[in-house]
Amino acid sequence: SGTIKILNNSIDFSLKSQNDKLRAKKIGIIYQDNNLLNDFTVIENVYLARLSLEENKEKAILDAKKLIKKLGLSNRENHLSSELSGGEMQRVAIARALINSPDIILADEPTGSLDMKNAKEVFKILLKLKNKNRLIIFATHNRFFANMADCKIELISGKIRKSTNARIR
């Protein structure tokens, strides 16, 4: 709980229903264990994340298809998410996080359950997003990926051990 300010909008996380739409529009979340709906298809997993904000189902589906294509999953859009590989599932999770065009993406160990090949693919996607003027905040235990960050904050037992200043690349 608490309050954060994003682009001159305050979001009070203790007022759940009042801020759900604003939070969904401004913040995309990528969970460590992807949080997909196993009995739903790839396309359903993505467009359902939009329906809370978009009443036009056809537009939500069209936008979801565009994202799925950008992430290289067009040939899997009608497969159940439970039929996907770990890397594919994480790309679907990224598409869900992006469907509302958020300004900020929070990623909790986005590569934690992936092999190195798929983990690098996911980070390539995240770096492309960063270059499109989105703020990406991610948690990782992997130093290789941590070193890709413009700014790092190292935590031990919930306390800041050290931090680095942001650098422009």
Language model: regions and residue ranges:
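ABC ATPase NBD coupling module
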Residues: 11-28, 131
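Conserved signature/switch motifs of ABC ATPase nucleotide-binding domains
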Residues: 24, 79, 100, 132
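Conserved ABC ATPase signature
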Residues: 80-84, 88-90
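Catalytic Walker B motif of ABC-type/P-loop ATPase nucleotide-binding domains
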Residues: 105-108
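Short coil-to-helix segment of the ABC ATPase nucleotide-binding domain corresponding to the Q-loop/switch region
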Residues: 40-48
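Hydrophobic anchor residue at the start of the ABC signature
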Residues: 94
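Conserved ABC transporter NBD signature motif
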Residues: 2-13
